[in-house]
């Protein structure tokens, strides 16, 4: 059964809507862990639209499970990661105009740069995951740059219309898991997962961790964060 990494970006989104001090994502991380979260994920974007540098610094000191820092592969972010020392880093694509991450990294198109970033971080004992589509060529490129993990982009699966298309996209993810395993890559997944579509992804062979945020934070507005996290844990375990 995969573990659950709770992404708390959207707690910060609510805070930044008013440029105030609440709700505090650090407090949300504590509640998520108490409810059974196996890890905490945050995306420190270049435009700082939600998570702020202060959040990452305090989370590094307070998270008791593990801290996954999502970031672009830029010199600024590498410097921050080396200073903060998260438990691992997930490199993600980033465009200022996007509402949320729109797809996986093009590792093939920037293989030399990715290899340099991966080497720099892993030399500092920070394992690196690459957020990529379940494309065989991209998975092979991830192995070539010596990443420890990949995180499969589940957005296309999540947006599939109808059972047939969803089944087709799930098979693409399964093939990605199989290819990654053959190359010695560990596999996480995330993006667009909800209480209604997560379980099939949790059942994929070799799946280690699911990073889920928006649906949990949305649910927490209605039932509270601890219950929302527990309910997602139940979904992953097949009890939901």
Swiss-Prot record:
Predominant cellular place of this UniProt entry's protein: cytoplasm
One GO CC term, this protein: cytosol
Binding site for 3-amino-2-oxopropyl phosphate: 7, 18, 192, 213-214
GO MF, one annotated term: pyridoxine 5'-phosphate synthase activity
EC nos: 2.6.99.2
Keywords annotated in UniProt: Cytoplasm, Pyridoxine biosynthesis, Transferase
Residues noted as binding 1-deoxy-D-xylulose 5-phosphate in the record, renumbered to the chain: 9-10, 45, 50, 100
Keyword Lipid metabolism found: no
Listed pathway(s): Cofactor biosynthesis; pyridoxine 5'-phosphate biosynthesis; pyridoxine 5'-phosphate from D-erythrose 4-phosphate: step 5/5
Keyword Zinc applies: no
CDD domains according to UniProt: PNPsynthase (cd00003)
NCBIfam families registered for this protein in UniProt: pdxJ, PRK05265.1-1, PRK05265.1-3, PRK05265.1-5
Protein name (database record): Pyridoxine 5'-phosphate synthase
Origin species: Acaryochloris marina (strain MBIC 11017)
